[in-house]
Amino acid sequence: MPNFLSNKPIPVADRLIMALDLPDVSEAKTLVERLGDAVSFYKVGLELFMSGDCFALVDWLKAKDKKVFVDLKFFDVPETVGRAVKALSRRGVDFATVHGNDAIMEAAARNKGSLGILAVTVLTSLDQGDLRDLGFQCDVQELVLSRARRALAVGCDGVVSSGLEVPLLRGEIDHELMVVSPGIRPVENRPEDDQKRVVTVDQAFRNGADYIVVGRPIRDAADPREAAQRAQAQIRDVFAAG
């Protein structure tokens, strides 16, 4: 098993990013309150943004001293993406995603301020068959590596990548590249869902991820706080073992 354990000065508790995949702000706030100090970093995505009052949620999270990752995968003409990123950076958000060509990624990076820009490589819900259906002639690893190299070249801070491809990134690209890995699933009782390229907490970090994003395994647990605490304990154990 590879060991590309991150040596970036990131507080261990911040390495777990909880995905607030919920239908409205009220439910999101209820879950945040329930999780308490078990989670310090939250991801807000399309579902919550479409529900309304999402910027009020972002401000509320920041007021509670939480870190915020806005995952909207900006993909529009470069001018529009640049302006959107600039507006978002004023909210004190920590990370945001972009999913486009070099010009789009460069516009985001140029207007980021203190915001960390993460380029999406290949969604964890896609596999090799899906790429073929989309017209790609390369394999998943080749596409992830190509997109990561281009993102770094135009000024992005990091990428979003399945933990399966992170060892390749660590072996081929500057170790300072920030890598956030979604698609985290438990070893046992792994649910059947739309995630196709998944890893465990331990695998993600040993493969070189700096952060992991966990949603359903915590959100849908009988006791979400206990599930989050268990994930945090796993992360502490990985870094303590080195």
UniProtKB/Swiss-Prot annotation:
Q: What does this protein do?
A: Catalyzes the decarboxylation of orotidine 5'-monophosphate (OMP) to uridine 5'-monophosphate (UMP).
Q: Which organism is it from?
A: Methylococcus capsulatus (strain ATCC 33009 / NCIMB 11132 / Bath)
- Record CDD domains: OMP_decarboxylase_like (cd04725)
Record keyword Lyase present: yes
List the InterPro entries hit by this protein, alphabetically: Aldolase_TIM, OMPdecase, OMPdecase_AS, OMPdecase_bac, OMPdeCOase_dom, RibuloseP-bd_barrel
Task: Spell out the reaction equation it catalyses.
Answer: orotidine 5'-phosphate + H(+) = UMP + CO2
Looking up SMART domains in the UniProt record yields:
OMPdecase
- What is the protein name for this chain? Orotidine 5'-phosphate decarboxylase
Q: Name one GO biological process term.
A: 'de novo' pyrimidine nucleobase biosynthetic process
Catalytic residues (UniProt)? K73 (proton donor)
The metabolic or biological pathway listed in the UniProt record of this protein is: Pyrimidine metabolism; UMP biosynthesis via de novo pathway; UMP from orotate: step 2/2
